[in-house]
A protein has these predicted regions:
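Generic low-polarity alpha-helical segments
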Residues: 1, 37, 46, 72, ...
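Intrinsic structural disorder
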Residues: 1, 52-59, 229, 234-236
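Short Lys/Arg-enriched alpha/beta "domain-start" segment
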Residues: 2-51
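Alpha-helical structural motif
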Residues: 6, 27-33, 73, 93, ...
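Bulky hydrophobic/aromatic packing residues
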Residues: 34-37, 41, 58, 86-88, ...
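N-terminal functional module of multi-domain proteins
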Residues: 42-142
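Alpha-helical bundle regulatory/interaction domains
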Residues: 108-235
């Protein structure tokens, strides 16, 4: 019997949220009626942080969403389940950057590419390329996603990106040309960016998330995709 773990509504709602300026969406979206969500817990009054609880046949998922900048969300993903299913595509100009902290995650994307993330690995793909099924073979997954609405970020870039002349709209062609998925295996550069995000004191979260998101985007601008793909061939 197939086990259903329905997160399609959460994914779609999150995509809709990042098209908002990232502040008042919770007051405008009837998210509490979404199928597959057992609880939606606003952690403040301005929509900055919201926790989504998702039930499944053999476990539980929690997504803690922070609206860091207009068009940029930082999401803590905690799953204690073996698999999840969802359907429906989301915007092709929305990128999802995933970092695996603990556990394993595997999926086959809409493009046919196989994605496998181990501890410390990073992946980038467009959200319309998301698979209908994700598996967690260890029945445990902990990680971070940074979701970018490329159009909105280009219109409202964070300060440092404006000064550097970087356009995040170029990320789609750089990392996801022809529907591909980019994977960078665990290395010190990735660990440096993400490791401290898992232990930030609450009172420092807002400024620290803003700094770390900008650091991540600057780092991705410097990534040599060709070299990383060659490294992937040698290490896989």
């Amino acid at each position: 019997m197939r086990k259903d773990y329905i997160i399609k509504d959460a994914r779609r709602i999150l995509a809709e949220q990042i098209r908002d300026n990232g502040r008042n969406t919770m007051n405008e979206n009837p998210i509490t009626n979404a199928t597959g969500l057992s609880a939606v817990i606003p952690k403040d009054n301005d929509g900055y942080c919201t926790v989504y609880k998702l039930d499944c046949a053999d476990g539980l998922g929690l997504m803690t969403v922070y609206q860091v900048y207009p068009g940029i969300q930082l999401i803590y993903n905690d799953f204690e389940a073996t698999s999840c299913y969802w359907d429906g595509n989301i915007g092709k100009n929305v990128l999802e950057i995933n970092h695996c902290r603990e556990g394993r995650e595997g999926s086959v994307l809409q493009s046919g590419s196989c994605l496998y993330l181990g501890e410390g690995d990073l992946s980038i793909h467009t959200m319309d390329n998301c698979t209908s099924e994700m598996s967690f073979p260890l029945k445990h997954y902990r990680g971070i996603s940074v979701v970018l609405d490329l159009e909105l970020v280009s219109e409202n870039p964070p300060g440092i990106l404006t000064e550097s002349g970087i356009d995040t709209a170029d990320f789609k062609n750089k990392f996801c040309a022809d529907g591909s998925c980019f994977v960078m295996r665990a290395k010190d550069d990735i660990e440096h960016i993400f490791s401290e995000l898992y232990s930030v004191p609450d009172r420092f979260q807002k400024p620290y998330f803003m700094l770390k998101v900008q650091e991540l985007l600057l780092f991705l601008c410097m990534v040599n995709v060709k070299q990383e793909k060659q490294r992937e061939l040698y290490t896989s």
